[in-house]
Every structure is written in C-alpha cells, then in structure tokens.
Amino acid sequence: MQPVRFGSPWIMAIGLVLLLLAFVSAGKSRQRSPANCPTIKLKRQWGGKPSLGLHYQVRPIRYVVIHHTVTGECSGLLKCAEILQNMQAYHQNELDFNDISYNFLIGNDGIVYEGTGWGLRGAHTYGYNAIGTGIAFIGNFVDKLPSDAALQAAKDLLACGVQQGELSEDYALIAGSQVISTQSPGLTLYNEIQEWPHWLSNP
C-alpha cells in the first residue's frame, strides 16, 4: 500500500471537503445568531426593589399585551428611573401588587427597562398575566405616537424574545383595551400596533 503524500489528490480532496464543511457551518451559525436585542436596563440598574412574590410564567409565552403608563414621558436613565421607582412603589404599596405591573417598559429614547422580565408574571392585564407579557410605553399616547426609537425598541424586543425562546413563534399581539376595561395603550398607539406582525384583532 502506497503512503499518502502531501500534495496528493486525496489530501487535496479532503482539504476541499473540510473547507466546504467550514463554510456551511459558518452559514448555519449566522442563521442561528440572535436578533439585535435592544438595550435593556435591568431592575437593579434603575433602582427597582425586589418582587414581593415569585409567580413564574410558562414559556414560551403566547400573548403580548401593549399598554401605556399614562405618566410623563422620559428619556435617559435618571428621569426614567424616577418614574419607574414611583410606579413600583404605587403598585406594591397602594395596589398590593407583588411588583411593578409590567414585564417591560420603554422610554422615549428607545431604552427598554426590565419590570418583571420574561420569567415572572406581571399584573398588567386580568386574565392574561400568566400567559402574556405586558409591554408598556412610558407616557400617554392617546393623541400621539411614541418616538420612532421607542417603537423600534418594542419591535426589536419582540424579535429578540422569539429568538431566545421566551415568546412563542406564533405569539398573538393585542392591546390592553381589547380585553379589559381600559383605554390603554391610547387610541393613537392602538391604531399603530394593528399594523404590526402577529396582531390579533379578536382575542
């Protein structure tokens, strides 16, 4: 049996196969890479207090419920943190909630703030807290839209949630006003989200 020499056709063929496999593997890795998740400030970063009770959500989550906070708007950690701290205190102390009621909140500069996050139930929408993620835009959006940065951050958060397995790939997007007695997320924002993917007109 002749020894295999460097530069022989066999070595060259094996090298080409390995090179091809490397390209295929790299392509698959790029396809599996997570979406560009938005900047998310964790609860400890905005000065949030620990939850008073731990009620976990079953994931992947089936519903996303959009709200607005009916507060002033904010940009930047300092201003948004003040609003969030006051909101959490009101929800825990006055409404007897375990935590701030929303899973995520979005400032007008497009920064996302962790509320109860993906893992814990919020208290945003009766009947949907255990099966839905509540996302609230900080501000009042009856007569106007959130900024483009805030809207894009919400879309990026949803795409990121699907990529990471937190949201079901066929999740349904709804407004709070569709399922409970509230004007949230405000008429103008309500009209906007009807054009988003996964919108469910009759929940």
Curated annotation (Swiss-Prot):
Effect of residue 101 to A: Increases PGN-binding and activation of Toll pathway
InterPro entries, per database record: Amidase/PGRP_sf, Amidase_domain, Peptidoglycan_recognition, PGRP, PGRP_domain_met/bac
Catalytic activity: N-acetyl-D-glucosaminyl-N-acetylmuramoyl-L-alanyl-meso-2,6-diaminoheptanedioyl-D-alanine + H2O = N-acetyl-D-glucosaminyl-N-acetylmuramoyl-L-alanyl-meso-2,6-diaminoheptanedioate + D-alanine
Protein's cellular compartments: Secreted
Pfam families: Amidase_2
Tissues/organs with expression: In larvae, it is expressed in fat body. Also expressed in uninduced hemocytes and mbn-2 cells.
SUPFAM superfamilies xref list: N-acetylmuramoyl-L-alanine amidase-like (SSF55846)
Region (Peptidoglycan binding): 87-90, 97-102
Interacts with peptidoglycan (site feature) positions: 182
Boundaries of every N-acetylmuramoyl-L-alanine amidase domain copy: 59-186
Induction notes from the record: Strongly up-regulated by PGN from B.subtilis. Regulated by both imd/Relish and Toll pathways.
GO MF term set: muramoyltetrapeptide carboxypeptidase activity; muramyl dipeptide binding; pattern recognition receptor activity; peptidoglycan binding; peptidoglycan immune receptor activity; zinc ion binding
Domain of life the protein comes from: Eukaryota
Keywords assigned by UniProt, alphabetized: Disulfide bond, Hydrolase, Immunity, Innate immunity, Protease, Secreted, Signal
Range of residues in the leader sequence: 1-26
Phenotypic consequence of residue 37 to A: Does not affect activation of Toll pathway
GO biological process entries: defense response to Gram-positive bacterium; innate immune response; peptidoglycan catabolic process; positive regulation of biosynthetic process of antibacterial peptides active against Gram-positive bacteria; proteolysis; response to peptidoglycan; Toll receptor ligand protein activation cascade
Disulfide bonds: 37-160, 74-80
Protein role: Peptidoglycan-recognition protein that plays a key role in innate immunity by binding to peptidoglycans (PGN) of Gram-positive bacteria and activating the Toll pathway upstream of spz activating enzyme SPE. Has no activity against Gram-negative bacteria and fungi. Shows some partial redundancy with PRPGP-SD in Gram-positive bacteria recognition. May act by forming a complex with GNBP1 that activates the proteolytic cleavage of Spatzle and the subsequent activation of Toll pathway. Binds to diaminopimelic acid-type tetrapeptide PGN (DAP-type PGN) and lysine-type PGN (Lys-type PGN).
Official protein name in the record: Peptidoglycan-recognition protein SA
Name of the gene encoding the protein in the UniProt record: PGRP-SA
